[in-house]
């Protein structure tokens, strides 16, 4: 099996020794995406905008692999404050409905002590090529 490295300028560059995603043929696994705007390097101030930016970054990577957000089968959401859970959930639901996901992906959501660049959340995803 050949592993292909996925990279797009439409998502932030890796800030460490890792890649944006790997394509295993039938699976695409993204690295965690923090809410950095790839064009400006800016991080939105509020958690809802951060959730949207992280999801858009994941989407850009998945699309570079030739898939769509509707192909995402699993996500992991890391939040700095679990009190943001409801706000993140609402934006997460909006994103997947806008992107014609047939239901919603499986998901884990965990609170963590700290994230790179002191952002409020990070999202990673697994997509399946059907």
From Swiss-Prot:
<dbReference type="InterPro" id="IPR019897">
    <property type="entry name" value="RidA_CS"/>
</dbReference>
<feature type="active site">
    <location>
        <position position="109"/>
    </location>
</feature>
<dbReference type="InterPro" id="IPR035959">
    <property type="entry name" value="RutC-like_sf"/>
</dbReference>
<dbReference type="GO" id="GO:0019239">
    <property type="term" value="F:deaminase activity"/>
</dbReference>
<dbReference type="InterPro" id="IPR006056">
    <property type="entry name" value="RidA"/>
</dbReference>
<dbReference type="Pfam" id="PF01042">
    <property type="entry name" value="Ribonuc_L-PSP"/>
</dbReference>
<comment type="similarity">
    <text>Belongs to the RutC family.</text>
</comment>
<dbReference type="InterPro" id="IPR006175">
    <property type="entry name" value="YjgF/YER057c/UK114"/>
</dbReference>
<comment type="subunit">
    <text>Homotrimer.</text>
</comment>
<dbReference type="GO" id="GO:0005829">
    <property type="term" value="C:cytosol"/>
</dbReference>
<protein>
    <recommendedName>
        <fullName>RutC family protein HI_0719</fullName>
    </recommendedName>
</protein>
